[in-house]
């Protein structure tokens, strides 16, 4: 018999200490990694539930195991909410991650050796969009498209590459691009050569759900996303489509299960269902609007302090600081800010002279800081502190002074009150 009073703290002190230290780190550090966010206690309640015990290979109403009548309800709730939130008529909530969702799309629609057009990782793309070090870059012939001198996606280049190479699929989406993507233009280019348009909206799904960023679902053949990041749910993936192509939907379902995964994680799917419901609330829209406002406010401060922001602006939740003119590496900046309890990530910038392990930039995002209640006044102050550290990167007194300010503001704006 399992007793409900069993707990980690009494049983595994070493593990519990590490878990508790991470709780403290999250409360006492300002999180500016664009792909990170804080999920709600409701989502964590779902993820810590007894649903983790249930195997449920298959889909609602078509399972390979018995005893699935209640997890069928859970999964159907998640499916229905995903479709309603993003205006889709198909949703698969089973992918364990965004990467697995992406590979399900590739598996469903491509053959090894097929040509795809994806955003250059060095220009803001994602590993799974055809990077040579990723399986997507090894299985398929990848033609990268990029940004122009203004830092915007070069659609003329994209169209020319599409005409020249005739890819079977064009991949939209990004991990470090601060502009607005013209999904309709991308579909026009895809249609001109008879290609699929596949959009990975992982970074901006929350903004899209709140009508703060354009929705690709009406334009793309298939859309994937993670359920964390701006959507603020559990870590996991989601596939969406619209248009009524039942043959496509069957291919996508088969590519997820049995093609790429076995049993779904029902406790995580329950967390997705909760997060999708939360994303329909009025306060979620206000939150996403503030995420975008905060990113713009931070960019204004960096520009006023003489820092180079790639493209000079942001229209979503993130932006890149190009530190080449400051003679700093992203690795140095990341480490110095970390000592001040400000968490960012080093990131390559366009035409970066440094390796991906060093880089010449940092990526900054506002979802997590906004989640804890920061508004324009707080993020402007925060951006100023970041400038202070980067302008005095070897001055430990400056770093310590900023750290104390960070600790103070974190105490005033706790993640979990």
Swiss-Prot record:
GO terms for cellular component: cytosol. Pfam families: SHMT. (6S)-5,6,7,8-tetrahydrofolate binds at residues 121, 125-127, 355-357. Its main location: cytoplasm. It catalyses: (6R)-5,10-methylene-5,6,7,8-tetrahydrofolate + glycine + H2O = (6S)-5,6,7,8-tetrahydrofolate + L-serine. It comes from the Bacteria. Pathway: One-carbon metabolism; tetrahydrofolate interconversion; Amino-acid biosynthesis; glycine biosynthesis; glycine from L-serine: step 1/1. Gene3D superfamilies: Aspartate Aminotransferase, domain 1, Type I PLP-dependent aspartate aminotransferase-like (Major domain). The modification N6-(pyridoxal phosphate)lysine is found at residue 229. It is found in: Cytoplasm. The keyword GTP-binding does not apply. Its cofactor is pyridoxal 5'-phosphate. The record marks 228 as: Plays an important role in substrate specificity. The keyword Cytoplasm applies. One of its GO terms (biological process) is tetrahydrofolate interconversion. Its EC number is 2.1.2.1. CDD domains: SHMT. Belongs to the SHMT family. Homodimer. This is Serine hydroxymethyltransferase 1.
């Amino acid at each position: 018999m399992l007793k409900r009073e069993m707990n980690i703290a009494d049983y595994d002190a070493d593990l519990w200490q590490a878990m508790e230290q991470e709780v403290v780190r999250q409360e006492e550090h300002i999180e500016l990694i664009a792909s990170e966010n804080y999920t709600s206690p409701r989502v964590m309640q779902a993820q810590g539930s007894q649903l983790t015990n249930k195997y449920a290979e298959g889909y609602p109403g078509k399972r390979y195991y018995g005893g699935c009548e209640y997890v069928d309800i859970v999964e159907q709730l998640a499916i229905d909410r995903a479709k309603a939130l993003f205006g889709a008529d198909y949703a698969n909530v089973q992918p364990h991650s965004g990467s697995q969702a992406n590979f399900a799309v590739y598996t469903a629609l491509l053959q090894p050796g097929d040509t795809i057009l994806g955003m250059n990782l060095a220009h803001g793309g994602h590993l799974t969009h055809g990077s040579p070090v990723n399986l997507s870059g090894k299985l398929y012939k990848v033609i990268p498209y990029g940004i122009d001198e203004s830092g915007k996606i070069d659609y003329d280049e994209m169209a020319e590459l599409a005409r020249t190479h005739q890819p079977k699929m064009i991949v939209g989406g990004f991990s470090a691009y601060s502009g607005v993507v013209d999904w309709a233009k991308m579909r026009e280019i895809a249609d001109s050569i008879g290609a699929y348009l596949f959009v990975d909206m992982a970074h901006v799904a929350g903004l899209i759900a709140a009508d703060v960023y354009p929705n690709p679902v009406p334009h793309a053949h298939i859309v994937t996303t993670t359920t964390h990041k701006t959507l603020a749910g559990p870590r996991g993936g989601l596939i969406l489509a619209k248009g009524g192509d039942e043959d496509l939907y069957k291919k996508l379902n088969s590519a997820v299960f049995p093609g790429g995964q076995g049993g779904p994680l029902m406790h995580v799917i329950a967390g997705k269902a909760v997060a999708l419901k939360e994303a329909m609330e009025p306060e979620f829209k206000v939150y996403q609007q503030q995420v975008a406002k905060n990113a713009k406010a931070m960019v204004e401060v960096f520009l006023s302090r003489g820092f180079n922001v790639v493209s000079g602006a942001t229209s979503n939740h993130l932006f890149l600081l190009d530190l080449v003119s400051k003679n700093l590496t992203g690795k140095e900046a990341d480490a110095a800010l970390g000592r001040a309890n400000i968490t960012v990530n080093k990131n390559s910038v366009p035409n970066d002279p440094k390796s991906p392990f060093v880089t010449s930039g940092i990526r900054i995002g506002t979802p997590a800081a906004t989640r804890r209640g920061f508004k324009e006044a707080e993020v402007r102050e925060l951006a100023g502190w970041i400038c202070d550290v980067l302008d005095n990167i070897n001055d430990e007194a400056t770093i310590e002074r900023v750290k104390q300010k960070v600790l103070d503001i974190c105490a005033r704006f706790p993640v979990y009150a």
